[in-house]
Amino acid sequence: ICMKNKKWISLAAAVVLAVTALPMGVFAAKKDSTEEKLTKVTLNEVAHSIFYAPQYVAIEEGYFAEKGLDLTLVTGFGADKTMTAVISGEADIGFMGAEASVYAYQEGATDPVVNFAQLTQRAGNFLVAREEMPDFKWEDLKGEKVLGGRKGGMPEMVFEYILKKNGMDPQKDLTIDQSIDFGSTAAAFTSDDSAAYTVEFEPSATILEKEGAGYVVASLGEASGYVPYTSYSTKASYMKENSEIIQKFTDALQKGMDYVQSHTPEEIAEVIAPQFKETDLETITAIVKRYYDQDTWKENLIFEKDSFELLQDILEDAGELGERAEYEELVQTEYAKNAVKEK
């Protein structure tokens, strides 16, 4: 597929520091004695992050196996790689920002990648300062240097969206450094004091706080309001040929959503801990609580039209949208609605 290099490279920013230090690899769903009867499904996720807790609950609690699916989870480390895996057929389902499907649509994809379930409804990153600022206001960024995200990626676009909402011009009122690789901003923040702020995903935000090197002063998720940040998608052709698999997959995810809505951050952290072996339980719990408290996860997986239009508004505002896509072309809500009915 022909992709706009800069856009696709910038999309990789969405993974960033939300990625816990795990080797790129494959994670299998729990299997039971009916293993040989399970249908194999490959899911490529943009990042392996506590931000996506309901998905890991569904894996660790065996919900996919209950629905007859043998799920293989592969971390793509970038929406460009995840989208490529879906389009090539290497992955059956992709998990990434829905803007990736809009970009592919703009490029003239003949078999569009359709979003069928929305997991997160807020941005997952935080503004970190060098000192505690209990009375922080977005106007405090005027004249300052901030380590930001890649152009065209959701983290950076949402950040600029917030600045504009607060009457600021991202190009004139402050300096946003977009030159640092997505996995290196936290290290750059601690080694070079030229920037007063950095925009960080977890676990980097919490780690900076634990080290006394930075302090979370604002949540981009709270400041932006509800935004369709990450969703599940597949090729229209795969959806047509494997409707039953998509429904079972969505049903299992909904059970994961139900779990996080009815359990404490401590309980959620214990369940997903095996997915983050290199992060201690205390840190996992703190991160889950931070996301839990800001209402990160939807109660259902339905990707509403208003959310899709808001996403395109943000893309348009950032100068990344050639032409608007029709909601019906890139979103299918049937499976998510059925999953809610089955509860």
Residue spans for each PLM region:
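Short, low-complexity disordered leader/linker segments with a strong preference
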Residues: 1-40, 339-343
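Short, glycine-/small- and polar/acidic-enriched structural segments
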Residues: 31-181, 188, 196-202, 213, ...
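Predominant activation on well-ordered alpha-helical scaffold segments within soluble catalytic domains
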Residues: 56, 102, 160, 206, ...
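Short amphipathic alpha-helical segments at helix boundaries and their inter-helical linkers
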Residues: 91-95, 292-305, 335-343
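Pocket-lining segment of extracytoplasmic ligand-binding domains
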Residues: 131, 183-276
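Secondary-structure end/capping motifs
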Residues: 240-322
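Conserved C-terminal helix/tail region of periplasmic/extracytoplasmic solute-binding proteins
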Residues: 309-343
